[in-house]
Amino acid sequence: MVIRSLLLLLLAAIVPVFAESGIDAWLRYARLPSSATRGHLTSFPDRIVVLNASKNGPLASASSELHKGIKGILGLDLDVSSRGGKHCSTQKSIVISTLDTYQSACGKLSPKLNLKEDGYWLSTKGGSVQIIGQNERGALYGAFQYLSYLGQGDFSGKAFASNPSAPVRWSNQWDNLNAATAAHGSIERGYGGPSIFFENGLIKEDLSRVPLYGRLLASVGLNGIVINNVNADANLLNETNLQGLKRIADLFRPWGVNVGISLNFASPQVLGDLSTFDPLDDSVIKWWTDKTDRIYQLVPDLAGYLVKANSEGQPGPLTYNRTLAEGANLFAKAVQPHGGIVVFRAFVYDQLNETDWKADRANAAVDFFKSLDGQFDDNVLVQIKYGPIDFQVREPASPLFANLPKTAVSIELEVTQEYLGQQSHLVYLPPLWQTVLGFDMRYNNRQSYVRDIISGEVFGHKLGGYAGVINVGMDDTWLGSHLAMSNMFAYGRLAWNPRADSRDIVEEWTRLTFGLDRDVVSTIADMSLKSWPAYEGYSGNLGIQTLTDILYTHYGANPASQDNNGWGQWTRADSKTIGMDRTVSNGTGNAGQYPKEVAARFEHTQTTPDDLMLWFHHVPYTFRLHSGKSVIQHFYDAHYTGAATVQRFPAAWKSLKSKIDTERYNAVLYKLQYQTGHSLVWRDAITEFYRNLSSIPDQLNRVRNHPHRIEAEDMDLSGFTVVNVSPTECASKYKAIATNGTGTATTRLNVPSGKYTVAVNYYDVINGTASYDVLLNGKSLGKWKGDSETHLGHDFSTFLDCHSAIRITFEGVRISRGDKLTIRGTGNAQEQAAIDYVSILPQGVVD
């Protein structure tokens, strides 16, 4: 009998691993193992009591979510009762209510609560649970937090109030109405499939993904969403689409998510047959007032408008010599009677002349907006990107945060990894974001963290907040990557509490997404926390920016693209020196845009931190950093260290194979293995570029020294031709081989007999599917297709370059000296079979 009981206990503790697509993200509500629930179920509340819930409101969603979550996590099917505000029975119950209703029914809570808008009180002490929101939305947030504790096996008694750091916590989607006519497809900088909202210029009939998205947003405390691209299509405002907007808002409303829209400033001219869009013209004012009134008729709780104006070709008030504030206030006055707000982006800049030493895109936000401080209406938020340029791998906090004391502001973060690996690379972003949120601007020589400026605390504003460019799509993983969802989760957590710890956040996300196993949690957390420093290491260092191709995909390496154009993301690199001189004394003056204490620090190399040295200073490659290294040697070392870090990710993930469902395990492994290869492409391209430019060798003799490589152009070729690659540093030794038909490349292996890893670096472009076979002495080691576009979501290339460069590896291959290695490639449609090199790597050696 004892043996049987132990066996049953053991079986109950085993949680089966089922295939999962990722659609539920961190809201899986997976059953806890019995070891985590032992001793807690008998005393668990047996019913959910909802006080005075409005129909289809957040309180009703909270009760249904609690029922669903508890049934999934604990296997308990609790009774749910909805009661009016005059009833109060809380014994062994989970009571969920707004504060006013609860206190009216049950008396004052103790201790006295100071709940802000959307805040909540959560108590799990005693035999009952109290989830009390300042409003219905707050109660929903409290319910999700309680379910997070349960999902992590945390049954400890708690009693606390939680308030959001800022009232505005929005998702921004850059979805386009019509993928066929938009410059960047269905979702600009989206890597998780097509839009969940739009199709062929209209709002989709099938909006079934919308409430699922709303649920995810609400679960991390996000209360608003702008559904369309800031490069807005005026046709969103036609009557057909406004009816569709109502349908979207109705689906988000139960989750407490208010819908907002991006506007095209020229809409009165585009849609309204007016001859002007001058914001001070009476006919334009009337057009916007009437249009806004109509929108609020359909969507009475519309969050408001988001406006991108006079930037990157978008129309705006400067066309008519009106100020940006006058442009913002046009919309602010239209939405003010309805309680809406206007978010006006500070991302305004002009094309610049690089020959002008003083020209600097980083100055643009302050140049355009500082003089307008105090001229914006009270319901306007100026939305500021976290850094002065554009979502780079490292930037200083935008100085504009310290230059608008009379204006409410919000920060714009980018969850989608536009410049940071586009979800094909694991890059966990909170450590990057916290370098900005935790930066002290020292306004008037007093403590003034960016996070406290955003909240309104420093300058006394009621309005303030966060915008996260998330860009989910129709892919089951939402963002195109299971691990990238940690960034969406973390964005919500940091918008609620910007002091939250990055490791705590990713560990919570991991438990909810992949389970409680300690090895799973520690492995994913460790990889995640190493990922941003690694990506910075093999992409762009010392504040030089990401060094990606800014003229094409924003994905692979192309450091030359930064310079010799008007975009202003310059490195000013030549054969002797590198970096932007942003000093007041000799440069663009950008350092002087910061408050005095910070400006003095950034003005001098002696007090500028190494990680921003090239952002603020133009120095020789031989300049000695605080670390003691020269700039160029730091580049070499950082790129090799960063790439080496991610080489360890696949092995770490493989150690979890028995603990992760097969579907997600394989999907993540594919991306991590891809990242190991692409990080080497990055490493080699950047180090080779600056080795060529500076003529300074790597002190450790790694750059240009690849003893395990066999260049494809040096093999015996049949059917292949030697081709150029551009940029040249995107190919080892600057050349590749390619064929439109079928070709073979053959060589004899002059290596000691033993076990090796065979790696093939090739190119995978879109618009075709080339096929490959690698053979040893005529026997196939493996076949594959150039079809990575079916597994990866980044912006693909039609060229042989650093975007299309990719690697495949075959481990544990036994080779004898003199063996014949052959690669057979066959082109297909527009894709040539193209090969860069082969590496024959001793076990444990990184190329």
Curated annotation (Swiss-Prot):
Compartment(s) of residence: Secreted
Keyword annotations from UniProtKB, A to Z: Carbohydrate metabolism, Glycoprotein, Glycosidase, Hydrolase, Polysaccharide degradation, Secreted, Signal, Xylan degradation
GO biological process: xylan catabolic process
Recorded GO MF terms: alpha-glucuronidase activity
Classification via Pfam families: Glyco_hydro_67C, Glyco_hydro_67M, Glyco_hydro_67N
Gene Ontology terms: cellular component: extracellular region
Residues annotated as glycosylated: N52, N238, N321, N353, N586, N692, N740, N767
Main location, first listed in the record: secreted
Signal peptide: 1-19
EC numbers on record: 3.2.1.139
Top-rank taxon: Eukaryota
Catalytic reaction(s) noted: an alpha-D-glucuronoside + H2O = D-glucuronate + an alcohol
Function noted in UniProt: Releases 4-O-methylglucuronic acid from xylan.
Family named by the database record: Belongs to the glycosyl hydrolase 67 family.
PANTHER family: ALPHA-GLUCURONIDASE A
Protein name: Alpha-glucuronidase
Native species: Hypocrea jecorina
